[in-house]
């Protein structure tokens, strides 16, 4: 039996040590912003921060959910910070970002799940950095009536919401969420604002079967999702769900081939693929692929 405590060579990354990495780290700290890069212990943080790419996490650093895969703190969240949108806009400007990714913790305690706060952040960035494209990675807004409309009206360039895993694992891995609610949210955003690119992702290596992954791929395409990401699940701490399997690069290539036959504008599937990994470059490719589809 394979030793799952030891990560295979294709998972290993270099430790961050560049000047730009530390400059990015200092700016984020000085502006009192949270990032999912740090909170979720992302393996790509060194590469991304060295390129001044970061995914800012709004709505605080404490989540109201307790997903078994996620390293973000869970508990009773703090009050909303009304100045966070302005500080975020300042960070985008100082880092001279061409593309910014904004995510958040789940806020089941808020009436709209934090949708209006996302909208305020988008508005502030548009004021000071009108040429910056904006990608948001949101919670599922479960039972939050009107949240999808607030997000669609805010007009992000990319709307991302991850289904995370296959439906059969939701009870143990993502107990506070509902698979079909996530699909519905993605579909509704596309119906409300067809010009917004939609994106979703999932992890593999949690014990799912390959046919279940293919079914999720089909479901996401049926929901009119444009961009699919698939990456390897990595256990953040011993208190989280264990890795059931390290999926090989060859298996990821197979999943990518399958997904591409379904009609997605873009597919990224690899061991280190994460929702926001290479997001700026991928957005440019996404637009190019869309234009090619229009003329074909």
Curated annotation (Swiss-Prot):
Names of the cofactor(s): [4Fe-4S] cluster
Residues where [4Fe-4S] cluster 2 binds: 63, 67, 70
Pfam families according to UniProt: LIAS_N, Radical_SAM
Keywords from the named record: 4Fe-4S, Cytoplasm, Iron, Iron-sulfur, Metal-binding, S-adenosyl-L-methionine, Transferase
InterPro entries in the record: Aldolase_TIM, Elp3/MiaA/NifB-like_rSAM, LIAS_N, Lipoyl_synth, rSAM
Boundaries of every Radical SAM core domain copy: 49-265
GO molecular function: 4 iron, 4 sulfur cluster binding; lipoate synthase activity; metal ion binding
Residues given in the record as [4Fe-4S] cluster 1 binding sites: 37, 42, 48, 276
Location(s), subcellular: Cytoplasm
GO CC terms, sorted: cytoplasm
EC number: 2.8.1.8
Keyword DNA-binding: no
PANTHER family noted in UniProt: LIPOYL SYNTHASE, LIPOYL SYNTHASE, MITOCHONDRIAL
Name the UniProt record assigns to this protein: Lipoyl synthase
Native species: Rickettsia conorii (strain ATCC VR-613 / Malish 7)
Highest classification ranks of the organism: Bacteria, Pseudomonadati, Pseudomonadota, Alphaproteobacteria, Rickettsiales
Gene behind this protein: lipA
């Amino acid at each position: 039996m394979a030793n799952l405590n030891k990560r295979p060579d294709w998972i290993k990354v270099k430790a961050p040590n560049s000047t730009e990495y530390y400059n990015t780290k200092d700016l984020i700290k000085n502006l009192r912003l949270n990032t999912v890069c740090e909170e979720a212990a992302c393996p790509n943080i060194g590469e991304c921060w060295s390129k001044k790419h970061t995914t800012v996490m709004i709505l605080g650093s404490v989540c109201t959910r307790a997903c078994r895969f996620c390293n973000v703190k869970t508990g009773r969240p703090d009050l909303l910070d009304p100045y966070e949108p302005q500080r975020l806009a300042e960070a985008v400007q100082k880092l001279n970002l061409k593309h910014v990714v904004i995510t958040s913790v789940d806020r089941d305690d808020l009436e709209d799940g934090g949708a209006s706060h996302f909208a305020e952040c988008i508005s502030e960035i548009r004021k000071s950095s009108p040429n910056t494209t904006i990608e948001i990675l949101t919670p599922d807004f479960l039972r939050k009536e009107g949240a999808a409309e607030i997000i669609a009206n805010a007009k992000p360039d990319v709307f991302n919401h991850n289904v995370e895993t296959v439906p059969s694992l939701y009870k143990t891995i993502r107990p506070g969420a509902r698979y079909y609610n996530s699909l519905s949210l993605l579909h509704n955003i596309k119906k409300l604002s067809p010009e917004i690119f939609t994106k979703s992702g999932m992890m593999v290596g949690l014990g799912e079967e390959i046919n279940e992954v293919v079914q999720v791929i089909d479901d996401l395409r049926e929901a009119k999702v444009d961009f699919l990401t698939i990456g390897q699940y990595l256990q953040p701490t011993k208190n989280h769900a264990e890795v059931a399997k390290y999926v090989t690069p060859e298996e990821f290539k197979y999943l990518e081939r399958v997904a591409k036959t379904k009609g997605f504008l873009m597919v990224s599937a690899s061991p280190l693929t994460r929702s926001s990994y290479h997001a700026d470059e991928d957005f440019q490719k996404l637009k190019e692929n869309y234009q090619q589809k229009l003329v074909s």
